[in-house]
Amino acid sequence: MKFKLIFLALLFSMCSNVTQEASNEIRVVSLSTTHTEIIQSLEAEETLIAVDSFSEVDFPVEVIDAYTVTAEELAPLNPDVVILAFDFNGIVEGLENQEINYVLLPPAKNFEDVYSQIETIGSLVNKESEAFSTTRDMKIEINRILDNANFGDTSVYHEIGYSYGIYSVNSDSLIGQIYNSLGVVNIANNTEDPFGSGYPALTEEQDI
């Protein structure tokens, strides 16, 4: 019997079956580009049996459309765990019905989320030591940068998309938090964001 895995419970529940295996025996499907990159940075790419279509890998692996794939389509791959950033296409319910382990790791909204997710992935693929070293080095470098940051009254507008509308970032997003930490005035912080997504939509008039 496989068990449902959710981010906050991962470190406790994974020990029931998945983390008992050697890392090169764990079969991971990553439907999140960010977490594919984390796995590669921890030198655990041998765990990947499939990745989303935006992940860049230089080794043979099945490529999957994370927006449309169903749990039924993933089941024949026999994954030990599926990594998700979003619940596209109702896949979470499908994975639960198929009794396939999954980890839901939504986009990080601050540095602590980033560190926590790296360490979570490290635990998942038996690279705890590498994950700890990575987050330790990141904290040192980020603190050094922040200590030396001096942008005065600098303001910034960060546009992240135009194909489906004009979108920016506010302080509810990781990028927005970085700007806040640097002391930069982020213009989009004052833009309405009704869903609290961290990525407010702007009109062309607001953009100008």
Feature names for model-found ranges:
Residues 20-27, 91-167, 188-190, 197-199:
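Extracytoplasmic substrate-binding proteins
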Residues 1-8:
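Sec-dependent signal peptide recognition
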Residues 52, 61-62, 174-198:
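His/Asp/Glu-enriched short active-site or ligand-binding loop at hydrolase and phosphoryl-transfer sites
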Residues 34-38, 44, 70, 87, ...:
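Stable alpha-helical elements in mature extracytoplasmic
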Residues 13-14:
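C-terminal motif of bacterial Sec signal peptides marking the signal peptidase cleavage site
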Residues 27-91, 100, 184-187:
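A short, structured surface patch at a secondary-structure boundary
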Residues 63-72, 192-205:
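Short helix-initiation/N-cap motifs at beta->coil->alpha
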